[in-house]
């Protein structure tokens, strides 16, 4: 590809981001009726200021699709903290790089939120304690409170492989409990994704991780709600 064409594509991508940012900014400044819209707008501008070279994706699925190239064809295992109806699980197991997946571990009570969160009531996302019916030999459900189930991670096999870790518990306490265990096994090349980074709970966790310097994080990209990082040595 010629230098001129590369520059043109780079500029087009930049222009697309700028136009999208202007739209979100307008919604934010005009005080959109939706609380989520306002928080999402604020999140986009905060991330753009903090990570100016990071790519903004218009959907989490498009962001997830890029994980394959970051894994560089390596074998990996997945950890999903907060499963609910299993939409994310299904999506990841259909990704092109899923052929390198050695196992997918989903952690949830399947009883919904244990307390109110944002605009949602206690019990939101409940499936009455029943995990989603997904046919895959890769799946292993860990049902119960994360404080009780997360230590099973320490005895799992293939912990030397790369990780894809999805944090979608929404609440600070549960996310922190999961992080405190999984961080002991993180290594260079692992990918971590926060699905509700625009909300205060996950934002607090992310800031604490960065400030603690337990791991060296490099941004892969973000959406209007979530953000993905890769662990670097």
Task: Label the model's feature ranges.
Residues 60-63:
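Extended, alpha-helix-rich binding/interface surfaces that flank or overlap catalytic cores
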Residues 43-51, 65, 69-233:
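S-adenosylmethionine/decaboxylated-SAM
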Residues 1-54:
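Membrane-proximal basic amphipathic "stem/tether" segments
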């Amino acid at each position: 590809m010629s230098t001129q064409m590369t520059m043109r594509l780079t500029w087009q991508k930049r222009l697309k981001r700028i136009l999208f940012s202007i739209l979100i900014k307008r919604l934010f400044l005009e005080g959109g009726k939706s609380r989520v819209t306002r928080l999402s707008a604020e999140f986009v501008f905060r991330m753009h200021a903090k990570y100016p070279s990071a790519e903004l994706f218009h959907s989490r699925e498009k962001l997830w699709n890029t994980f394959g190239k970051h894994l560089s064809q390596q074998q990996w295992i997945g950890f999903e903290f907060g499963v609910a109806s299993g939409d994310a699980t299904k999506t990841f197991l259909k990704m092109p790089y899923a052929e390198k997946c050695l196992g997918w571990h989903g952690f949830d009570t399947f009883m919904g939120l244990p307390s109110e969160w944002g605009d949602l009531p206690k019990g939101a996302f409940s499936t009455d304690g029943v995990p989603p019916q997904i046919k895959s030999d890769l799946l292993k459900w860990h049902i119960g409170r994360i404080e009780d189930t997360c230590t099973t991670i320490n005895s799992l096999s293939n912990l030397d492989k790369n990780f894809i870790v999805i944090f979608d518990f929404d609440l600070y306490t549960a996310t922190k409990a999961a992080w405190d265990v999984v961080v002991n096994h993180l290594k260079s090349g692992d990918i971590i994704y926060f699905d509700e980074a625009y909300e205060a709970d996950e934002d607090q966790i992310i800031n604490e991780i960065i400030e603690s310097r337990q791991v060296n994080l490099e941004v892969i990209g973000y959406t209007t709600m979530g953000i993905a990082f890769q662990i670097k040595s």
